[in-house]
């Protein structure tokens, strides 16, 4: 660690303010330093591909709130998105009451997925035996129910997951027995997220990249050391290389890389 480097910070319970982050970044730019750890950490290679570790991580993720999509992705009643999250097929729907609900995307008869992709629908019908569910997850119809028997009624609604909408984002917990307590999980970070007004953003779409190791991909977003070498024509001309502000907040972290336009803030009174 450089003598002038600032160690990574552990929050005392309060979020780093914008002015505090800016002051720290300006100091790093002037002194050619960055936030770093207090010790050297070597990540074991097996952490990137060990299946048992991956399964344990997915189990943990399923018990915690995760941002599934922006609110603008479900603009009207019947809007839905169906995709996998942490290894589970999820169906998120905005109901006629405006409330967003999350379900396991699996028919309660034989487990076929009842929806794919995204769109707008009043009901979801299983492509195997045509069991039909409403946007509230309730079983609405069973083909040839007289011959099938009334046993299919009552407890055959789609399995619901805890779901919460706030700050223009839709959160879900992939464990029916858990709670989606966003404020308890994110604390002050939720207020910071709400200030971004994501509800006013326009949803364009999503792209799924198959085959990538998600940890390797994520690593690239946790450091700015590679900007000059890997992005000499795009990011590097506009962003300071290897200058970072880091703040730990409970199990969460805030990471920021300054664009060179940050210099304009020097002329603005604090």
Regions found by a protein language model. Name each.
Residues 52-58, 150, 159-161, 189-195:
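Intrinsically disordered, low-complexity boundary segments flanking structured domains
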